[in-house]
A protein has these predicted regions:
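A short, surface-exposed loop/turn module that caps and links secondary-structure elements
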Residues: 51-84
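Arg/Lys-rich, positively charged N-terminal/basic patches that mediate binding to nucleic acids
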Residues: 1-51
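Generic, well-ordered alpha-helical segments
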Residues: 34, 38-41, 55, 69, ...
Length: 129
């Protein structure tokens, strides 16, 4: 187990995760001010998740066997911005390494929309690499 001096677990990103963040937080020149405010809140929420995972790599719920057995040891966080009503629209899927015992690394596999199981598909692809 290798914690840094602050007692936090390092968070690393699978290839493509930063692109995921860019996709869901992109603003077009024609977007209205409400969209810009939503994107700002979403960026803030993602930053909070990073801090939460560093402090507690078990913050997400264990996925377990189910529709995606290859993600059984992964964890997921359902999240959205505070003003959004209804089901959270986004998922963070990550894996603690090693998966048993005290993790030395929190590997984010994806941050993507819930719709169409996009987050799960991306995590599946990246977990094989």
């Amino acid at each position: 187990m290798t914690f840094d001096s602050s007692g936090e677990v390092p968070v690393t990103f699978a290839q493509g995760v930063l692109n995921d963040v860019g996709e869901i937080t992109a603003i077009s020149p024609g977007d209205n001010p409400e969209r810009a405010a939503e994107v700002k809140a979403l960026k803030h929420r993602i930053a909070e998740l990073l801090v939460e995972c560093k402090a507690n790599p078990f913050v997400g719920e264990l996925m377990g066997p189910g529709l995606h057995p290859e993600l059984a040891t992964c964890r997921r966080v359902r999240f959205d911005i505070p003003s959004q009503k209804g089901k959270p629209r986004f998922r963070l899927i990550y894996r603690n390494e090693p998966s048993d015992g005290a993790p030395s690394e929190c590997l984010w596999l994806t941050i993507a929309p819930r719709a169409g199981l996009r987050a799960h598909r991306k995590a599946q692809q990246r977990s094989r690499l």
